[in-house]
From Swiss-Prot:
Lineage per the UniProt record: Eukaryota, Fungi, Dikarya, Ascomycota, Pezizomycotina
Membrane topology recorded in Swiss-Prot or TrEMBL: Peripheral membrane protein
Family affiliation: Belongs to the COQ4 family.
Self-association state and partner proteins as the record states: Component of a multi-subunit COQ enzyme complex, composed of at least COQ3, COQ4, COQ5, COQ6, COQ7 and COQ9.
Catalytic reaction equation(s): a 4-hydroxy-3-methoxy-5-(all-trans-polyprenyl)benzoate + H(+) = a 2-methoxy-6-(all-trans-polyprenyl)phenol + CO2
Name the UniProt record assigns to this protein: Ubiquinone biosynthesis protein COQ4, mitochondrial
Organism, scientific name: Blastomyces gilchristii (strain SLH14081) (Blastomyces dermatitidis)
Involved pathway(s): Cofactor biosynthesis; ubiquinone biosynthesis
InterPro entries for the chain: Coq4, Coq4_euk
Localization terms from the record: Mitochondrion inner membrane
């Protein structure tokens, strides 16, 4: 092989029990067999690679639901060939969705003034959003760029969904704990039909018994009911809604606000502490 022929390596992360980490498996593919990228950062995949990426990232994200990179890879590997196109078509069929596709806005600390959002009146969408970011200790710059979706426009749709995820958190009030993430992902599945959001429900098995019971009885019915009843959230131009009343926007979208999960968890912890204190007192 001449020096002009380069070798491209795709690393497929397949999680296997190995302490607290996972084993990385690599397979090399000749650049001659790989089509050129369709946009900056694009990594074209063969059918085998896409399947391996889906399986590996699914296992890895199940073992560690906090691995955002694996969840992102799973989302991209399972979104094609149908689901991301359905979401793109939903945007094309909506006037606001078409504007979003034309304008290609991005959500980051460079495009949103966090200090301005903090100055907005209470209960506005912007103040609710930044309040949620502050409370959860996260920021708008944590979303990885899309790499594995071939169609450039569909890649933007996935990027837009990914960057709007925290707005979904803020408008529903769900925290970033695993219980809150699973509830929100279930809502997103009912609303967007992206397979990754549905597969995230398997993380329920990692919840504590009380949390699982709460999910089945409280969060799952809410997520299905609200996700199916609400408008397509991908078509919300969040940048234009920042000064609106959050309750008004929820009503317009048809999103029912779930029970305050943080307050529920606090109440359960207080109740457990009181029960343990009572047992300790009885044992004296």
């Amino acid at each position: 092989m001449t020096p002009a022929v380069t070798q491209t390596i795709l690393t497929v992360r397949i999680a296997r029990p190995h302490g607290y980490g996972y084993v990385l498996l690599s397979r090399g593919f000749s650049a001659l067999n790989r089509p050129p990228p369709n946009y900056p950062g694009h990594i074209p995949l063969t059918t085998f690679e896409r399947g391996a990426l889906a399986v590996g990232s699914a296992i890895g994200s199940l073992l560690n639901p906090r691995r955002g990179d694996l969840i992102a890879a799973l989302g991209e590997a399972t979104a094609t060939p149908y689901f991301i196109y359905r979401l793109r078509d939903a945007m094309l069929s909506d006037p606001t969705g078409r504007r979003i596709l034309r304008d290609r806005p991005r959500i980051s600390s460079k495009t949103l003034s966090i200090e301005y959002l903090r100055s907005l009146p209470p209960n506005t969408v912007g103040r609710t959003y930044v309040g949620w970011l502050d409370r959860e200790g996260v920021g708008p710059d944590t979303r990885a760029p899309v790499q594995y979706i071939d169609d450039e426009e569909c890649a933007y749709v996935m990027q837009r969904y990914r960057e709007c995820h925290d707005f979904y958190h803020a408008i529903t009030g769900l925290p970033v704990v695993v219980e809150g993430e699973v509830a929100l992902k279930t809502f997103e599945f009912a609303n967007t039909l992206l397979p990754m959001t549905g597969l995230s429900m398997f993380a329920v098995m990692r919840l504590k018994p009380a949390e699982r019971e709460r999910f089945w009885k409280l969060h799952l019915p809410w997520a299905i009911r609200s996700g199916l009843a609400s408008k397509e959230v991908i078509n919300v131009y969040w940048e234009e809604q920042l000064e609106r009343d959050a309750n008004e926007l929820r009503e317009e979208l048809g999103i029912e606000k779930p029970a305050d999960l943080r307050e529920i968890r606090k109440m359960m912890r207080r109740q457990k502490a009181a029960e343990e204190a009572a047992k300790a007192k009885d044992g004296q």
